[in-house]
């Protein structure tokens, strides 16, 4: 789910920037910053988890939500930059935790299989993202370039609520 939500940056940002008459050439730079931000938390992930504790996933989702919001409401193309960075940082923190929780949950003999399923889900999100977005645009009768960011922001907010409500459960206990 998180993979699907953040894919709006890579799949839809150039179209949003073009619709707002921004330089679509700068979208490549912004997408590069997004991927750089995904990588960056890996250098200090243990410290981040120690600092944020059982609210790590909640704060990661908050970063994604604020980033999507900044991208959506941006009156200038350079306000999109912190949005891309926040989405990337949030994803860069939560994605390794998903793999870690998968290893903790699986029985030792099935760890590789469990990780393979997580990877399959990520690749399915990448494959299906455009179709899911198009389907919901059709349902809501909109062709807006902002729609993927608004829709994914709503999904992220609902997931944040779930993460907050269940922060003491095994799934969210880091």
Residue ranges and their predicted role:
Residues 40-53, 137:
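Helix-to-loop junctions at the C-terminal end of transmembrane segments
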Residues 93-106:
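Intracellular juxtamembrane helix-capping segments at the cytosolic ends
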Residues 55-70:
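Structural signature of the two symmetry-related core transmembrane helices
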């Amino acid at each position: 789910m998180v993979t699907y939500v953040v894919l709006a940056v890579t799949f839809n940002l150039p179209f949003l920037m073009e619709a707002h008459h921004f330089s679509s050439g700068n979208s490549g730079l912004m997408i590069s910053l997004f991927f750089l931000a995904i990588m960056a938390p890996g250098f200090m992930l243990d410290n981040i988890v120690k600092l944020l504790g059982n609210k790590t996933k909640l704060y990661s989702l908050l970063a994604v939500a604020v980033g999507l919001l900044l991208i959506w409401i941006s009156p200038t193309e350079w306000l999109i930059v912190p949005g891309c960075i926040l989405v990337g940082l949030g994803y860069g923190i939560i994605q390794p935790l998903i793999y870690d929780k998968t290893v903790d949950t699986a029985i030792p003999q099935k760890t590789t299989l469990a990780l393979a399923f997580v990877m399959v889900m990520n690749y399915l999100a990448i494959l299906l993202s455009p179709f899911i977005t198009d389907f919901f645009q059709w349902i809501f009768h909109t062709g807006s370039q902002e729609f993927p960011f608004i829709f994914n922001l709503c999904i992220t907010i609902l997931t944040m609520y779930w993460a907050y409500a269940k922060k003491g459960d095994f799934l969210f206990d880091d």
